[in-house]
Amino acid sequence: MKNNYYNDKFTYLFEKHNIDTNNIKFLLAVSGGLDSICLFDFFLKNKFSFSVCHCNFNLREDSKKDLKLVKKLSERNNISFFSKNFDIKKYAKKNKLSLQAAARKERYKWFDNILEKNNIDLLCTAHHINDNLETVIYNLVNSTGFRGIRGIKVLRKNI
């Protein structure tokens, strides 16, 4: 591994949580954004065993471009690739949820399904500081109490 800031952070995180990267199969949730592409690059450079999944919620004009990018990166590097199109607007309306809550619920249900069906140990998602801030605000607005102030957990269950 190159000795740089991000490699050191990842290495520390894996060691802190006793994650043996040599004996674990990972599933990376890759959106096509910079944070998840960096995660993909890190796993690729370190030759970890991983597959990639991509959710297309069809909420932005660039959704199809993101899907093409992530699929192309995966195929070019012989990485197993999973993708799914979601009709989140319909699901959110039917279940009286915000788009964010509906997307979160549906994607994690799908992620769990992939993990189980493919005997994959751990899901990795990439987040930047704004994602964490949004989570804290969302949790505060939805009255989660002090637990919500902590934002996105570093590790929970198999995620």
Q: Each predicted region: which residue ranges?
A:
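Core alpha/beta nucleotide-donor-binding catalytic domains of modification enzymes
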Residues: M1-I159
